[in-house]
């Protein structure tokens, strides 16, 4: 049974809540191929949104995946759906703010794939809260710890593992088109940090044959963004694309970036903004 008609219908109903008169939904995604055949990838925040879409695109491309998330129930559900493809899929509960746990969890991940070399890390886990002037210190710490600090230290663990074992793999960081704008929220500030971290990792690891890049989506139809904008359709009205970007589109690019097709792309941030990058200060309000 083809699930696309049902998915499209639900998405249209969801988007209609934002008073949009017409949105064309295109869910074209990577078809089954062998671009990543036999490889092993860790994808943080892989239970929904962009993370899940990347995991699905990877398994369609022959990759074995380890997805992480904070909820065991959501992990089990995602693993169950991904397991219909002929690859290995494993889920691990991981809190991106608990840096002290990274070493042990990574060892357990290696055991789960019987010591096969893990050669792809996708840093996708992220959270968001309201921006200035309503951000609390607790929210600020949560965003920076999850989005930036966690990515930094997980990349450190994974990078050392690849260097020590002579693995010529990939690190792909999910940044954001918001990092093109002045930061007035902890989320945007964290994504500015991801930009810098991506460049630094790329420079440090290139000599070891490890390719590091970033992918920076614009407003994407993920549970996090749709929830945050449930009473505000500004994104759809102002974005030149005219609608939210679909996670599957971001996932398609992720496959290219970690495959041999993307080998010449190194230390780059690929922006998939839906036109957000050409908006002016007048298009995006800044105020308290």
For every predicted segment, state its role:
Residues 206, 211, 265-267:
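Short, small/polar-rich loop/turn modules that mediate ligand/substrate recognition or access, typified
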Residues 40, 47-49:
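Conserved glycine-rich cofactor-binding loop
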Residues 243-272, 277-278:
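C-terminal substrate-recognition "lid" of short-chain dehydrogenase/reductases
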Residues 131-144, 235:
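Substrate-binding pocket helix/loop in short-chain dehydrogenase/reductase
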Residues 155, 190, 198:
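Active-site helix of classical SDR
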Residues 176:
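Residue(s) in the substrate-gating loop at a strand-loop-helix junction
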Residues 27-31, 266-288:
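Short C-terminal tail/terminal secondary-structure segment
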């Amino acid at each position: 049974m083809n699930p696309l008609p049902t998915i499209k219908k639900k998405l249209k109903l969801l988007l209609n809540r934002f008073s949009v008169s017409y949105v064309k939904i295109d869910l074209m995604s990577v078809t089954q191929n062998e671009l990543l055949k036999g490889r092993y990838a860790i994808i943080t925040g892989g239970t929904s949104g962009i993370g899940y879409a990347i995991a699905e695109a990877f398994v369609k491309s022959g990759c074995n995946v380890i997805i992480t998330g904070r909820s065991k129930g959501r992990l089990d559900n995602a693993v169950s759906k991904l397991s219909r493809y002929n690859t290995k899929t494993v889920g691990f509960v991981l809190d991106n703010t608990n840096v002290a746990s990274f070493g042990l969890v990574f060892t357990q991940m290696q055991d789960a794939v019987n010591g096969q070399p893990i050669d792809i890390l996708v840093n996708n886990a992220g959270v968001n809260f309201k921006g200035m002037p309503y951000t609390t210190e607790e929210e600020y710490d949560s965003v920076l710890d999850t989005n930036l600090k966690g990515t930094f230290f997980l990349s450190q663990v994974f990078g050392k593992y690849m260097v020590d074992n002579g693995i010529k793999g990939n690190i792909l960081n999910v940044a954001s088109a918001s990092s093109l704008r002045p930061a007035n929220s902890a989320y945007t500030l964290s994504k500015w940090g991801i930009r810098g971290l991506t460049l630094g990792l790329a420079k440090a690891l290139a000599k070891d044959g490890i390719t590091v890049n970033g992918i920076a989506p614009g407003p994407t139809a993920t549970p996090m963004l749709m929830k945050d904008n449930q009473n505000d359709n500004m994104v759809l009205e102002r974005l030149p694309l005219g609608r939210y970007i679909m996670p599957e589109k971001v996932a398609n690019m992720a496959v290219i970036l970690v495959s041999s097709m993307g080998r010449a792309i190194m230390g780059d941030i690929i922006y998939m903004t839906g036109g957000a990058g050409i908006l002016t200060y007048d298009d995006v309000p800044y105020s308290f």
